[in-house]
């Protein structure tokens, strides 16, 4: 929904919030039950054979809430409570995290997930992104390499120290003056791999930007990556563990998450390439058997479920084939297992050779 709603239009959003809450009050005052319609979005279905429209950003259904049923009454109550907090944030030009909002009324919200759902409902209702509400994520991501930029007046000069980790900015919409001499962006799943590359001075010998979400990526990391893609037009490669969890992280970067399917266009990296680790890498790079772990029953169930996602067959059949191979072999391994013969193997051999292969492929 980026572009539909800039932060500079917060006054317009405030007026729409005021109009909405006023209409709810009028309904209640006149003895009518408020009727709130929330569109439903999804970025995939679990039928690979379906001729579906999951790849579009159009609603896939609609929920209608009234005060006639207790669960719906509670959901409306939570939506309005969070909406009043959002209204205050916008009026005072302040920002808050989802956790901050939860602790404003912990006894009423009961769980963080209640706040998360209410924020999602508000974004859908007002056709905006979370950042338009001045609701920010507590960033976990790190970045290093051939890049410098400003965020809300703060200077981030990664170019001055190529292998030093900088925090991914929280206020991504306020990032400006982006300058880069990089040839590509490398996203790595884990901080341990990020630090390994930093220790090996990877960015000194490879003109790139390295980003990690330190596991499952938060909104700030995904939004920042999307911004860099839009501004720099660089190829993006992703390195994750060869296991179901690593693939889920890869899929979240590339296709977005189901939880935020309503805002998929501002968060996904549609041209991201899977650099590794692939099931076949264990043989190609002679990973010792003691580094190969058996897939658990939970791993197998998760992999089988991921194989049903429509976007794999439609857009990335080769990724689906790799998943099937992992399931057939029944083993998984971490990226670090590739470095069993040499600590610098990832930075000196594996990643550069994979990048060269991607560059030379048609």
Curated annotation (Swiss-Prot):
Active site: 103 (o-(5'-phospho-dna)-tyrosine intermediate)
GO cellular component: chromosome; nucleus
Location in the cell: Nucleus
Tissue specificity annotation: Expressed in shoots, young seedlings, flowers and reproductive tissues. Not found in roots or rosette leaves.
Subunit structure comment from the entry: Heterotetramer of 2 SPO11 (SPO11-1 and/or SPO11-2) and 2 MTOPVIB chains. Interacts with MTOPVIB. May form a heterodimer with SPO11-2. Interacts with PRD1. Does not interact with TOP6B.
Species: Arabidopsis thaliana (Mouse-ear cress)
Keywords for the protein's UniProt record, in alphabetical order: DNA-binding, Isomerase, Magnesium, Meiosis, Metal-binding, Nucleus, Topoisomerase
GO molecular function, one term: ATP binding
Family (UniProt): Belongs to the TOP6A family.
Disruption of the gene: reported phenotype: Plants show a semi-sterile phenotype and a drastic decrease of meiotic recombination, indicating that SPO11-2 and SPO11-3 are not functionally redundant. SPO11-1 and SPO11-2 are both required for double-strand breaks induction. Drastic decrease in chiasma formation at metaphase I associated with an absence of synapsis in prophase, due to the inability to make double-strand breaks (DSB).
Keyword check for Translocase: no
Enzyme Commission designation: 5.6.2.2
Protein name (record): Meiotic recombination protein SPO11-1
Topo IIA-type catalytic domain sequence ranges: 8-142
